[in-house]
Structure formats: structure tokens, C-alpha cells
UniProtKB/Swiss-Prot annotation:
Organism superkingdom: Bacteria
Membrane topology recorded in Swiss-Prot or TrEMBL: Multi-pass membrane protein
Function: Pore-forming subunit of a potassium efflux system that confers protection against electrophiles. Catalyzes K(+)/H(+) antiport.
Subcellular location as annotated: Cell inner membrane
Principal location class: membrane
Keyword flag Acyltransferase: no
Protein name according to UniProt: Glutathione-regulated potassium-efflux system protein KefB
Species name: Pectobacterium atrosepticum (strain SCRI 1043 / ATCC BAA-672)
Any one annotated GO CC term: plasma membrane
Record domain RCK N-terminal: where: 400-521
Disulphides: none
Length: 603
């Protein structure tokens, strides 16, 4: 593509993302499906704004590459070792069973045994990008279904390598000694990457970090990710696997969090571009010509993979509440199918219309997953919330609660227990289905659902409740719920959990007066006890704690971020901190002159 055409395409991608994704979110069909529909609209079979789909699809695979790097950063070799049984046990079983059934189905049509074999293996692969994105949206990455799903995806990434090597053999291409020599060189280069990454990358980042220039650190992070991907592609291996390994090698380094922050914005945009390009690749001409055959193929693909995954979840004793999510989120075809099928077509293993038919089937199966996950959410909500009610009724009981608590993790549990101990009527909403099932077994009335959905809040009684307490892990979810409540339930008193000062500032800017920084109070309490152990009288330590809390809150409000630049903001922070330290010292000096009337035992 020429530079002007590339710039035009970039602007077009940003425009459709900005327009389509919010509309999709408002319609409740999810961001991923919004990207796919946007891709269909601007692609060669839609409005025709973009023609060179293959080049864009190849470039957009970098979204998956960045995603796998960040996932690698979140693991370490020890944690990966603990997943070995699920990777090579459940992962291998999923690929083997799915490939056997789907390949057999292809063989019963007009596919040869060679094309049926490679077709079955390709269809057995799931979309790493889509599955991981949906897992994060649904909060599955924190429970058993998410961990097992990740293990299956990782095995699929590994399985692509021998599958690609199998294609020339199926095509009848004879190898020679030179082929084995090249394979040996690739293995040696791969081992060299592992050793170099282990012993050279960390000192390199230490040298770069010492410069203190953030832009150079970001450039180095991009160089590491893109360099690893390019190196693995040159070896004929998976780019995503290479960056995943690079992430694991740095998972225990002191630069892990900085790397994650540097890469995150690129990952999000490129993943969106990947889904748009998948939508553009959908051949509507083939779909129109063979619509019945393709629809049956999509149905069989999703049903077979879903059934295999559900069976594996059951024999691995996964909680009943998580099996459907596990089966649904991996039920689609994946991006590696494009690679496998294109390679097979180049060796003439796939012939005629077999390639476009398979590609359209995979693309449509990817479009079914967001909708399927919504159906599963509804099924789980009805199963684990209200029992034996007509379908038209809401799936959360409106008990006319005084308080709605969003999130039932450790933070939300403490709040809920305190409220229930004081006979308050509460409704608890939780998105993690395993937590809902577990807490209901202990007698807690917890409902499954995503509180960022307006109808769920309305069903839970938000229009009648006096307060809502938001304890979400994700700050973006907290802010979305805050905006929903302010817009649709203005009489609802909002109380929220803030993970730190940044989230606290965001809440203050939206007008939320009551919030708690999750580590602030416990840190103050431990600080007070430390003062007592150092010899300060318990009364003075308590007063010091109270003064510090009040003054820190004052500083938090005074230092609200303004559009004055980083240097001005830093200057304001330093000046305010000095001023508040002076005030604190004067107030504590007055406190020391007051008589002490109680000691530590009076608490």
C-alpha cells in the first residue's frame, strides 16, 4: 500500500472503531462483534473502502503478538510448570478429539483424507485473540475455566508448528538431508533465543532504564516484542509463541510492570484492527453461493467443539457453573486456521473452493462466539439466580434492597457481612460465576450478572435502593457503573472502591463523595500500631492517624489533575506536601500538650 493509502486506511480504521464499537456496546452485542461488523462494512464485500485485506490481516496479527507478550509477563516459569498437565493433557485431548470428529465429517463430504486431516486440525484451533479478550471481559481469567482455557490455547499455539511441518508430507513433497539441516539450524536458533533472552535482555533493560528517558524504554519494549515476532517468523514458527516466551523470560524481572504499561495501548488498538480485518476477510460471495452448506458447517463446528470442551471440563471435575463458559469461549475457529489453510492451499492439499469455504466457516464461527457467550450468561443467570420463574420476568429478584453491592470479592464480602450483620437488606451482584455458586452454597444471596448493564441494575432494584456500593476490580467497570447510576438513578447514593489515587481523582471528578482507597485504611492502622511500638502513647498515635487521614484527604482534593502539564503538576504536589507536613507538625505539637485519657487496652 502507498503511504497516502496507508494513512487513509489508518484514519478509516480509527473512525469505524470509534463509531461501531460504542454502538455495539450500547446494543449489548460486545466490542468484538462490533469490530467484526465494522470490518464487513468497509471491506471488499461491503462498501469496498479497503481492498488489500491480506496485507492488513498479516499486519493486524501483531495484536495477538502483543497480547501473548503481556500474558507471558503475567506468568513465570514456575507458574507455567504447574499448568503442564492441563496444557499437554486437556489441550492435547481437545485438539485430538476435535480434529478427529471434524476431519471425519470433512472426509464424508468431498475432501480427500489429506485435506480432511489438515482441515480437521485447522478447525480444532480456537481464536486466541477472541477467547482471551472475552475471558477478560467476563472475568474468567481469575477462575478455573479461564486457566484451563488458557492452557488449551497455549497447546493449540504449540500444535501449529508440527501441523505446518505436516503439510508438505501430506502433499507428497520428499525431503532431503538439507531439510533436516535447516530444521537443526532452526532448533539451534530457537535455543539461542532462549539463552540470549535469559541472560542478555535484563541487563539491556537495566542500561536503558538508567538513561531515565521513558520514550527510549517504550522503544526498547516494542523492539523486543517485534524483534521476537520477526525472529520466530523467520524460523517458520508462531510469532505469538515467540513473544509469549519473551514475556515469560521477563516475568520475574523488575521491569515487568513498566513493560506492561508500555505495550498495553498498542495491544488494544492492534487487537481491534485484527478483528476488523477478520471481518473484511469474510467472502460474502462464497457465503451467498453456498449459504446452506456454510451455515450447517458453522453449526457443526461450534457444536462439536463445544461438546468436546464440555466433556473435557466435566471429566476434569470443573465446577458445573463454569463448564458452559469454558465450552462457549473456545467454540469458534481461530486465526491459525487462516495460516494452516493458506499453507495447505499453496501445496495443493486444499483444492478448488475448499479453501474459501473453510475460511468463511471459520470467520462466521468467530462471529457467533460473542452472541453465544451472551446466551450462556442468560442461561447461567437464570440457573444461579431466580429459580422456577417465567422467562419474561427479570433474572434478578427485586427484593427492594436498601443497598446494592457490586462485586463479591474480598473487599465486597467484608462490606456485605457488615451490612447483613446490621440487618440491612442488600442485593449482591457478581460477574464471576464460580464465586456466585460457591457463596450461594454458604447461604449468601448473590446474583450472577454484569452490573455495567442498565437492565440488570434496574432489575436489582436500583431505582428503589438508597445506596450502591461498587467494589469492582477493574477501574473502568467502576466508572461505567458510576456513569450509569448518575444518569439513570440520580437518587442513588454512590459509594465506591478506589484502587489508588488515580481512581480516587476520577471518582472525585465525577462527583462521587464517598469512596475508599483499598489499602489506605489498613496501612494507616498498621502505621498507628507501629507508632505505639516505637513508644508513642496510644491516644497520640490514634490522633496522629486521624490527622494524617484528614490532611491526606485534603491534599487529594487539592491536587486534582489539571491541564497544566507534568512539570507544573509535580511542582504543585511538592509544594502542597511541604505545606501539609507543616500543618501536621503544628497540630501534633498541640496534641502532645493534651492529657492522655486512655491507653491501648481501651480499644
Amino acid at each position: 500500500m502507498e503511504s497516502s493509502a496507508l494513512l487513509t486506511a489508518g484514519v478509516l480504521f480509527l473512525f469505524v472503531a470509534v463509531v461501531a464499537v460504542p454502538i455495539a456496546a450500547r446494543l449489548g452485542i460486545g466490542a468484538v462483534l462490533g469490530y467484526l461488523i465494522a470490518g464487513i462494512a468497509i471491506g471488499p464485500w461491503g462498501l469496498g473502502f479497503i481492498r488489500d485485506v491480506e496485507a492488513i490481516l498479516h499486519f493486524s496479527e501483531l495484536g495477538v503478538v502483543f497480547l501473548m507478550f503481556i500474558i507471558g509477563l503475567e506468568l513465570n516459569p514456575g507458574k507455567l510448570w504447574t499448568l503442564r498437565r492441563s496444557i499437554f493433557g486437556v489441550g492435547a485431548a481437545q485438539v485430538g478429539l476435535s480434529a478427529l470428529i471434524l476431519g471425519g465429517a470433512l472426509y464424508l463430504t468431498d475432501f480427500s483424507w489429506q485435506s480432511a486431516l489438515i482441515g480437521g486440525v485447522g478447525l480444532a484451533m480456537s481464536s486466541t485473540a477472541m477467547a482471551l479478550q472475552l475471558m477478560r471481559e467476563k472475568g474468567m481469567n481469575r477462575n478455573e475455566s479461564g486457566q484451563l482455557g488458557f492452557s488449551v490455547l497455549l497447546f493449540q499455539d504449540l500444535a501449529v508448528i508440527p501441523a505446518l511441518a505436516l503439510i508438505p508430507i501430506l502433499a507428497g513433497v520428499q525431503g532431503d538431508f538439507g531439510d533436516w539441516e535447516r530444521i537443526g539450524l532452526k532448533v539451534a536458533a530457537f535455543l539461542g533465543m532462549l539463552i540470549g533472552g535469559r541472560y542478555l535482555v535484563r541487563p539491556l533493560f537495566r542500561f536503558i532504564a538508567a538513561s531515565g528517558v521513558r520514550e527510549v524504554f517504550t522503544a526498547a519494549a516494542l523492539l523486543l516484542v517485534l524483534g521476537s515476532a520477526l525472529f520466530m517468523e523467520a524460523l517458520g514458527l508462531s510469532m505469538a509463541l515467540g513473544t509469549f516466551i519473551a514475556g515469560i523470560l521477563l516475568a520475574e524481572s523488575e521491569y515487568r510492570h513498566e513493560l506492561e504499561i508500555a505495550i498495553e495501548p498498542f495491544k488494544g488498538l492492534l487487537l481491534g484492527l485484527f478483528f476488523i480485518s477478520v471481518g473484511m476477510a469474510l467472502n460474502l460471495g462464497i457465503l451467498y453461493t453456498h449459504i446452506v452448506k456454510i451455515m450447517i458447517a458453522v453449526l457443526v463446528l461450534v457444536a462439536v467443539k463445544g461438546a468436546v470442551l464440555y466433556f473435557l471440563a466435566r471429566i476434569n471435575r470443573m465446577r458445573r457453573s463454569e463448564r458452559l463458559q469454558f465450552a462457549g469461549v473456545l467454540s469458534q475457529g481461530g486465526e491459525f486456521a487462516f495460516v494452516l489453510f493458506s499453507a495447505a492451499a499453496s501445496f495443493n492439499v486444499l483444492k478448488g473452493e475448499q479453501l474459501p469455504l473453510l475460511l468463511v466457516t471459520v470467520t462466521l464461527s468467530m462471529m457467533t462466539t460473542p452472541l453465544l457467550m451472551q446466551v450462556i450468561d442468560r442461561v447461567l443467570a437464570r440457573r444461579y439466580n431466580v429459580q422456577d420463574v417465567p422467562d419474561e420476568k427479570p433474572y434478578v429478584e427485586d427484593d427492594e434492597p436498601q443497598v446494592i453491592v457490586v462485586g463479591f470479592g474480598r473487599f465486597g464480602q467484608v462490606i456485605s457481612r457488615l451490612l447483613m450483620a446490621n440487618k440491612m437488606r442488600i442485593t449482591v451482584l457478581e460477574r464471576d460465576i464460580s464465586a456466585v455458586s460457591l457463596m450461594r452454597s454458604y447461604g449468601y444471596k448473590v446474583y450472577y450478572g454484569d452490573a455495567t448493564e442498565l437492565e440488570l441494575l434496574r432489575s436489582a432494584g436500583a431505582d428503589k435502593a438508597r445506596s450502591i456500593v461498587i467494589t469492582c476490580n477493574a477501574p473502568e467497570d467502576t466508572m461505567e457503573i458510576v456513569h450509569l447510576c448518575q444518569q439513570h438513578f440520580p437518587n442513588l447514593e454512590i459509594l465506591a472502591r478506589a484502587r489508588g489515587r488515580v481512581e480516587a481523582h476520577e471518582l472525585l471528578q465525577t462527583g462521587v463523595r464517598h469512596f475508599s482507597r483499598e489499602t489506605f485504611s489498613s496501612a494507616l492502622e498498621l502505621g498507628r500500631k507501629t507508632l505505639v511500638t516505637l513508644g508513642m502513647h496510644p491516644h497520640q498515635a490514634m490522633r496522629a492517624q486521624q490527622h494524617f487521614r484528614r490532611l491526606d484527604m485534603r491534599m487529594l482534593r487539592e491536587l486534582m489533575p489539571q491541564l497544566t502539564g507534568d512539570v507544573a503538576q509535580i511542582s504543585r504536589v511538592k509544594e502542597a506536601r511541604r505545606e501539609l507536613e507543616d500543618i501536621f507538625q503544628r497540630e501534633m505539637l498541640r496534641e502532645r500538650r493534651r492529657p492522655s485519657v486512655w491507653d491501648e487496652d481501651d480499644e
